[in-house]
């Protein structure tokens, strides 16, 4: 019994000793950051009176290289006035004291920034540093961000006949915007627009957006970085509501939306709901362009790279496409069906037709290309018209149902785009689309303003 008690006492002593923390290292220690500079992409400066926008949160680790515990202090060199914010192991503030770091272990530092207006028309750099100290020795991580002033529009019903003409700084839309019925929203050449994640532009009136080849109108998500150029679902999109009409988009570049442009219902007074010329709509989560019993004309347009559809004509409508390229590289979504779709009916979840409307679609001198064997989807109810007038197109299709005459189309040949995986759909030398266009069209320039020569090339780009 005495031996057992002695054994237990010895065991408890060993456990107690093993649980004791190694002694603190009091002398100077050079902590090891995972990077010497933390870069933030361009960030819009703050809207006056608002915390918007705030950057994404970036993370760095700072390692204790020693075989002993240390206590580290962290500080922003800019103090309370810094544009940056830090959080170390759950403790936030411009100055954080006594953070314990185990031997050969690391702590994580979370960094955000929000930038004050700088009164510049171009992005201006903002710098600060994180200082990490142990025993008087300092390690430094430089923080760098570019701040860009903007004209802000937030949750607005636009005044009738609003015109955006300023090109000194971009416009940033935060929340939804509405164009009232009977009003026109005009945008001048060269205007840049960035839309937040919860932005949808609703249109009861009409749009008059007319850029030029050298000064297109651009609208995209509100993270101005080349890394996000081709990412979908950064904002909602443009929604032309029922009874809107006669909207026109020329030389526009619309990207990064969930649904690029949705158009509802035939216009009351004739004409088109939407006419697009020399316009690009790309990198959309659902569809680039979707018409619901709408009337849409597109000339020299590029609709590319969407989760489901580059073009959708749903429940009838009238659609006229000339010299358009509709292409998908398969990098957005995992669709199993064609990205160009037309239907004169609407079905319920059991596949039963619940509504029908006549459909008429003309397509001339266009390209429809993608990674599927069949890039067309047609759903035609025999009870109402489903009229197609297709000619002189290059299409990836099995032509099931025999909707397209084989005599004046090119089926299932590689159009030889320059770099489709990078979203570049210009034609290369030797493309079967070169000089194959109908001579009856009178389109004198391509999407970029380059002069077309007879016979024209198919698609939105003339080979040069």
State each model region's role.
Residues 1-4:
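Positively charged n-region of N-terminal signal peptides that target proteins for export
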Residues 6-9:
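Sec-dependent N-terminal signal peptides
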Residues 15-18:
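C-terminal motif of bacterial Sec signal peptides marking the signal peptidase cleavage site
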Residues 20-25, 31-59, 89-422, 432-447, ...:
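Beta-strand/loop edge motif enriched in small/polar residues
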Residues 64-83:
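Short acidic, flexible loop segments centered on an aromatic residue
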Residues 77-95:
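Short, solvent-exposed loop/linker segments at beta-strand-coil boundaries, enriched for Pro/Gly
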């Amino acid at each position: 019994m005495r031996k057992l008690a002695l054994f237990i006492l010895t065991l408890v002593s060993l456990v107690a000793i093993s649980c004791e923390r190694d002694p603190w290292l009091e002398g100077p220690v050079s902590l090891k950051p995972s990077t010497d500079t933390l870069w933030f992409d361009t960030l819009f400066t703050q809207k006056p009176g608002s915390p918007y926008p705030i950057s994404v949160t970036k993370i760095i680790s700072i390692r204790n290289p020693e075989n002993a515990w240390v206590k580290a202090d962290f500080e922003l060199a800019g103090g309370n006035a810094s544009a940056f914010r830090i959080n170390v192991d759950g403790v936030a503030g411009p100055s954080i004291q006594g953070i314990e770091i185990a031997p050969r272990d690391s702590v994580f530092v979370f960094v955000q920034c929000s930038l004050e207006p700088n009164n510049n028309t171009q992005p201006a750099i903002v710098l600060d540093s994180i200082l990490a100290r142990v025993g008087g020795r300092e390690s430094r991580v430089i923080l760098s961000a570019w701040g860009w002033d903007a004209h802000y529009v937030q949750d607005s019903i636009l005044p009738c006949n609003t015109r955006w003409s300023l090109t000194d700084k971009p416009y940033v839309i935060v929340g939804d915007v509405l164009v009232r019925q009977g009003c026109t929203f005009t945008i001048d050449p060269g205007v840049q627009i960035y839309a937040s994640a919860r932005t949808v532009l609703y249109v009861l009136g009409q749009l008059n957006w007319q850029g030029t080849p050298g000064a297109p109108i651009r609208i995209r998500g509100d993270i101005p970085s080349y890394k996000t150029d081709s990412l979908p679902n950064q904002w909602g999109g443009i929604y032309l509501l029922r009874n809107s009409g006669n909207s026109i988009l020329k030389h526009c570049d619309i990207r990064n939306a969930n649904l690029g442009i949705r158009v509802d219902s035939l216009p009351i007074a004739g004409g088109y709901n939407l006419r697009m010329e020399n316009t690009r709509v790309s990198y959309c989560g659902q569809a680039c362009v979707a018409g619901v019993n709408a009337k849409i004309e597109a000339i020299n347009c590029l609709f590319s790279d969407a989760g489901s559809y580059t073009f959708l004509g749903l429940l009838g409508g009238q659609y006229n496409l000339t010299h358009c390229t509709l292409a998908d590289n398969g990098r957005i979504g995992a669709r199993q069906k064609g990205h160009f779709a037309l239907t004169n009916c609407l079905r319920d979840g059991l596949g039963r037709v619940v509504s029908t409307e006549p459909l008429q679609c003309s397509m001339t001198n266009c390209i429809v290309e993608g990674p599927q064997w069949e890039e067309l989807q047609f759903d035609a109810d025999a009870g109402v018209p489903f009229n197609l007038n297709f000619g002189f197109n290059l299409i990836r299709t099995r032509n099931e149902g025999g909707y397209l005459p084989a005599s004046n189309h090119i089926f299932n040949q590689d159009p030889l785009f320059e770099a489709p995986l990078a979203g570049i759909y210009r034609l290369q030398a030797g493309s079967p689309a070169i000089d194959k266009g109908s001579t009856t069209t009178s389109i004198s320039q391509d999407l970029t303003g380059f002069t077309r020569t007879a016979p024209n090339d198919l698609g939105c780009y003339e080979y040069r």
